[in-house]
Amino acid sequence: MRNAAAAGLLADGFKEGAAGRFEETVRGTNIKIVLQYDGTRYDGWQKQGNTDRTIQGRLERILERMTGQPVEVYGSGRTDAGVHALRQTANFYLPPDSQGKEWTPEAARDALNRYLPEDIAVLEADHVPERFHSRLHAVSKTYLYRIETAKRADVFQRKYVYILGRTLDADAMERAALFLAGRHDFRGFSSLKRTRKSTVRTLDLPEIR
């Protein structure tokens, strides 16, 4: 689907206990955030050398402004250019503030929201164990694709739908979705042909509505 505005990351799933007892590390306090963003004017999640319009890049610049040190943000997944997220998960290590005090999750959340633009917002922030990693501990992801069958989309929804302009056969789509559900090896879609990492994934039954 070429119109990335139609896609959105709804939420990430994590193993129970992955965000357990708070621990400190020499790198700083490990903080997990849940954020949402409108990806319309961004070139995706991942920071890139040829653009400064990325979600990760924007977060890292603000965190460096907050701490005076470079801070790397680890996202649970990468959304493409123009794709939105309702509940994207990320984590980062915050060094002590200028007075030597550890950052609380609430203080980090409020500071980020103070400097972030209106199309990015941190919803939640929590202490997590030192070894917690948003991408490595994610066990599921949920995506939403919205397709407008009318020839002209609602003015206020046009950035969030793919305009197909013709009627879809929802019954046929539901039958086809049955072939996609289940456990499959996606090695053929991987750019890394030789990797020790498993390319087997489980696709839950898509909902067509």
Language model features with spans:
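Structured-RNA-binding interfaces characteristic of tRNA pseudouridine synthases
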Residues: 10-209
